[in-house]
Each structure stands twice: as structure tokens, then as C-alpha cells.
């Protein structure tokens, strides 16, 4: 239970968290730019324009199907259209009321065709979030359709339930004072937006997302949304450019511009959610494994294989989220290294999304891993193009000697590398034992 003392303690620690918050935002901004966030927002804007009518039709139909929510339908409509078009909500609502009534007259095939645009919107949003969360594989089609249907049906019910609870709270507060009611009504849109964004970041990406990270991203997106509403309204009022150019049709570009703003805010909130685990892991996460030195790549790969071997002893695999926790080098590095190890046939992903080792680590060596990751000196160095100078043969001799030395030193099997020292035995004695078993001289 959150007591007043704990709340005061959290508030006292808040100023100390500001540098971290600034750092997360500074990390998220270039991440958003590199992921082409504005271009994706533009694409989602036009897809949303086509999908809104069937989406709103289903949403309001669900409200009508539950008599208890019937009286809340108008409140829900007001909240939805205020979020969709804060400055021209009345005009947009009038248009969509007409569109929704026209959609009711469609035949079965027409309804199916119209509904496909809603499915395409969901797939587009899923693809955008998968890019942000570095999910390389989409869900199976059946799972995707079921997730879409769950979001489409559950969200209106949650909205209705929250409005019902809020109405009861407002009724109780009216007896105590007007200020409390005003504050609650002012905060309600932002709270609902934060809840919706949090669920979106949790449910849609094909990636395990911690609820705390999704909550932080949802709150950040909701705050940006409320600030954007105010700024958008002030801009439209102060600079009536669209009304001057388009006249009565100005509602169309204004509505498109606002949808573009909404999707930019949503995608940036998703970037913050995806950035948090990377930020906790440290600065190394700003690059993928290709940005690391060779020795660092090998260390990350060996750390992943070590965790997979430990899990294999229990007969289980490890999910990516667990790996990111146990090997805290950041999501980018973990994802990239898993892809490289999978391409080299060292690991594989199971149907339930867990990762397992596919090679017998008792026989495999560090040198095998080095070659699989492309870090060895390969190729015929004595014949490169038309080069045939004497220095070329001498350089080839040096490379061959270096490769032979590396092969000798790194020919340690993972069973020996991962061996725990017996109780009371220093790690140096274990190193000596490894040398004796493998016949190596010098340091490992």
C-alpha cells in the first residue's frame, strides 16, 4: 500500500531521477529518427483514415450490445472524437456519424471489404512496433488475428468500464466539492490514453515487454498527447492557414495533420519503452554487435551460450527477455548476436519463442565459435587478384602463423571454459588444469 511516507519519499527522490529521464529521452530521440518514425507515422495516418469507419462502427456497436453501457455511449464518443480531432471534433464527428450510418447499409461482402482495412491497420501498427522493439519475426497469422480481435473487443469494454466507474466516483465527489470533480474530469482523458498506450506496448509487439517499461512509455505518450492537444489547438486558432486555403474542406487536412501528430507521439512513446532496458544496460547498447570489437563480440556470444547451457541442464530454453537480464549488454546487442549465432547454427528458436543451443558445447571450442562468427583469417592470401609481390608471400606466412597460434590458444572446449572451480581451489589452478587437459602452453 502506498502510504503518505512512501509517497513523500518517492517525491524526494524524483529530482535525482531527472538526469536519467533526460538521458533516456536523448537516447530515444535518435532511435526514433533512425527507425524512420516520422515516415512510419505518415504511413499509419493514411491507413488509419481508411480504417476509422469500420473501427468506430464496431466500437459503438459493442457499446450498444451492452445495455449497461448504453448511457455511456455519448460520453465515449465525446472522448474519442476529442482525441481524434481536438480542434475540429464537432465537424469530424458529424462526418463520421454519417459514414457509420452509411456503413450499416452495406452488404455482407461490402462489410468484409471494409473490415479488411481495419486488419491492415492492425498489421501496420504491429509491423511498426516490431521494428521499434527489434522483433524480427511476426506472430503466426492466426495469433495475429486473434490478438486483433481481442484488442478490438476488449478496448471498448475497458473504456466503458472505466467510464462507468468514473461516473460513480464523480457522483460521489459532487457531494464533497466541485474542485475534485473538475480535477477528475480534467485527468480522465490522459489516464485513459496512458492505459490504452500501455496495453498497446504490452500486447502488440512480438517481444516480451516489462509492464513497468510499457507503463512509463504509456505515461510519456499520454503526457505528450495532452501537450500536443493544447499546442495543436493554439496553432489552429492563431494561424488559420487551412481555413484560408481550403475553406469548408479545411477539416480534412487538419484531421490528417492531427492523426500524423498522434501517431508520431505513439511511436515515440514506444521508443521510450524500448529504450528503457537498453538504458539500464549501459551505453554499450547504443550499437549492435557489429559495433563491438571482435573480443567483445566473442565475450557476448560465449555469455549467451553459457546461459543456454545452464538452461539445457534443466531441459528448458531461455527467452530473449531473460537473456537480456542475465547478459546485461542491451537489447540491440543480444538480438544481433542471437541472429548471428542462429545463422551460424549455434542456437535456434523454438516454437514458443525460447532460445536453445543446437551444438554440443562439450566438444565445441572457442576457436570454432570464432570461425563461425567470421573473425578468423580466411582465404588464399598468396593470390589476391594479380598481386604476386614478394611481400605478399611474407605477409601470408605471418597470417598463417598468427592463425595457427590463435587456433592453439583458443582451442579450449566450452566444457573446460565453463567448469566451476572445486571448493577451495583458486581460479588460477583451474586455468592450469585446463592447459594440461588441452595441451596448451602459455596463457589462455
Swiss-Prot record:
Keyword Transmembrane helix assigned: yes
Location, primary (coarse class): membrane
One GO CC term, this protein: plasma membrane
InterPro entries, alphabetized: UPF0761_bac, Virul_fac_BrkB
Membrane disposition: Multi-pass membrane protein
Keyword Membrane: yes
Protein name, as recorded: UPF0761 membrane protein RC1_0578
Keyword annotations from UniProtKB, A to Z: Cell inner membrane, Cell membrane, Membrane, Transmembrane, Transmembrane helix
Entry's transmembrane regions: 49-69, 103-123, 145-165, 186-206, 219-239, 248-268
PANTHER family reported for this sequence: INNER MEMBRANE PROTEIN YHJD, UPF0761 MEMBRANE PROTEIN YIHY
Annotated stretches, region: Disordered: 423-444
Pfam family, one: Virul_fac_BrkB
Subcellular localization(s) per the UniProt record: Cell inner membrane
Similarity section: Belongs to the UPF0761 family.
